[in-house]
Amino acid sequence: MITPQGMERLKEEHDHLWRVERPETTNKVSWAASLGDRSENADYHYNKKRLREIDRRLRHLRKCIDDFKIIDYHPHMDGKVSFGAWVEIENMEKALKKRLRIVGYEELIGNRDHISMDSPMAQALLDKTVGDEVMVKTPAAQFKWRINKIEYQK
């Protein structure tokens, strides 16, 4: 599962790798190969390795783009925590507030305010409503959180 915004980021990354990075790296490999002896040619070896990394990432992104199901906002989701929701929660004991978005694993990279739908926090929040209190059990401790607000990107 993935949000529409997450899918757009995957497509943008795929497009950038395919249209910009891969051609640049291929040109560097060709240039380095034209210098002759490849056995001690660091540019050649580095760029061949980089090309393999780009191709691996492109295959992964293509699989994700083809296989992931986009979960878009629907009015029936209002008032309840579901996949893709922005949830404002508050820990009354520590006077701590957080705003989190529940997403799939592929959307976590580079997003500090996103949590995996498989995380203990997300599992505790799913299907709850504003005003509900949830106990979140982690390996380190157990915390009580109250849901203050639920929003969806429409």
PLM features: what roles do these ranges have?
Residues 71-151:
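Non-DNA-binding regulatory cores of transcription-related proteins
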Residues 2-7, 61-63, 107:
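Short amphipathic alpha-helical segments, especially helix-boundary/capping motifs
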Residues 42-75, 79:
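Internal alpha/beta loop-helix hairpins
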Residues 17-20, 32, 61-71, 124, ...:
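Conserved, well-folded catalytic cores of nucleic-acid-processing
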Residues 1-56:
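N-terminal cationic and glycine-rich segments that engage phosphates or anionic surfaces
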Residues 9-11, 17, 50-56, 65-67, ...:
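Generic detector of short, locally flexible boundary/turn motifs and exposed helical patches
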